[in-house]
Amino acid sequence: MAAQKKQGERVLPARSTRKRRQLPDMLYYDERTDSYVTPQERSLSEANAQTRPAPNTINQAVDAKQSAREARVQELMKSKLYHLRKQQKQARHKRDQWAIDYLEWKKNEDEDVWNSDAEATGPAEHTSSFLDALRFSQQFMKAE
């Protein structure tokens, strides 16, 4: 369907000619295989899913899925990346530990402040009572 062109008119294409960004083939998570699959494999697995498996095969599939997951976890534990992340985490903890300790200490310091409502005697009263005790004991020192 070619557009009719009048004199001095530009013919614009029906669709933009700008180069389109090619989207990558997305991977979809497939619950049945417990893995990531391409769209073609996904449509195949959906077609296979239309036929219902027997109950005992479901249990076998669950067991297989579980063992596959455990194997992957073991792989991850052994992998270098896991250990690198673990070391980074420990280093971060060591680096920030002083701040955590300081906050704990500061909190305790703030709690130690004398509360005049809760206590009948404060630092000044303690000092004066100590001086009174000294004076009292001096009487006996003189007597001896």
Swiss-Prot record:
Ranges where the record places region Disordered: 1-58
Signal peptide region: none
Cellular compartment(s): Nucleus
GO biological process, one term: DNA repair
Keywords, in A-Z order: Chromatin regulator, DNA damage, DNA repair, Nucleus, Transcription, Transcription regulation
Transmembrane segments: none
GO cellular component: Ino80 complex; nucleus
Main location (coarse class): nucleus
Residue ranges, compositional bias (Polar residues): 35-58
Known role: Component of the INO80 complex which remodels chromatin by shifting nucleosomes and is involved in DNA repair.
Assembly and binders: Component of the INO80 chromatin remodeling complex.
Listed name of the protein: INO80 complex subunit 5
Organism: Schizosaccharomyces pombe (strain 972 / ATCC 24843) (Fission yeast)
Taxonomic placement: Eukaryota, Fungi, Dikarya, Ascomycota, Taphrinomycotina
Gene that encodes it: iec5
